[in-house]
Amino acid sequence: MRKWYLATTLAFLLAGCSGEEGADNGGQTVGADRPVVFASNYPLQYFAERISTPLVDVRLPEFGDEDPAFWMPTSEDILALQQADLVLLNGASYESWLKNVSLPSTRLVVTSEDFKEQFIPQEEATTHSHGLDGEHEHSATAFTTWLDLTLAVKQVQAIRDVFSERWPEHKGQFQSQCGTLMQELEALDAEVKMIVEKDPSVPVVFSHPVYQYFAHRYGLNGRTVHWEPHEIPSDDMWQEFATLLGSHTAKWLIWEGEPSPDIIAKLESMSIQSVVFDPCAGKPDGGDFASVMRLNMVALKTVYGQQ
């Protein structure tokens, strides 16, 4: 009986230790000795992983199908954020959930802090619905900063600097891996400029107010509507769109995600083609930030007659 008890206790303890070593609220298997950093959106996670792999465990909250900009954390999410070594924030009004969460200020890293003067104000705050997510409001400040790839580079540098300060023993590796990432982003920046500069007067319409930094940096001649890829626009929205085309003769509508076939067909009846330029705020189903941006380059070349 005593032998059975000891064996059972030992097995239980070993199982507990094994589960604790690999536990991770994001479903990842990680070592218990790595520092944990949370990122408020996928671009920041990607940047941080590129800089710090394999030294830091960089995690995303469980957003599900929700846009990270309008995510509201559960009590479990808040606890995980409070226990993290650092929390990377986009800034520019991106994290509306911060108003309802108490986190140690010493662990918060606002990656856009050094270019606040370059924030783009929205013409007006707008409230609308994203399907099952319910109503939400776009703030008075545009927040998809990383679509200006020069600003993405600055966010990368901010992550590198705080990691180097927090874990100075790894500074050399952080700097080296950051340098490689910055070169890739700078090459993408140059490619976008080259594509658009061939004919910047081409009129386009953006499906959603998330392309402000992109349009500003690269000089796109764009106007914006508030449409969702899988929600058929109302009659009033179609009428507003037709009115817009009266003064802005666009032939392309640029979407965040693949629109429904019914929307595509209706647009084609108006001689409007659809193309997807994914901001990549959430983790893609396949590939990574770099591969999504490569697909975006293909889409952009199509719009500008280079494909």
Residue ranges of model-derived segments:
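Positively charged n-region of N-terminal signal peptides that target proteins for export
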Residues: 1-4
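Bacterial N-terminal signal peptides
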Residues: 7-15
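Extracytoplasmic metal-acquisition and chelation regions
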Residues: 17-307
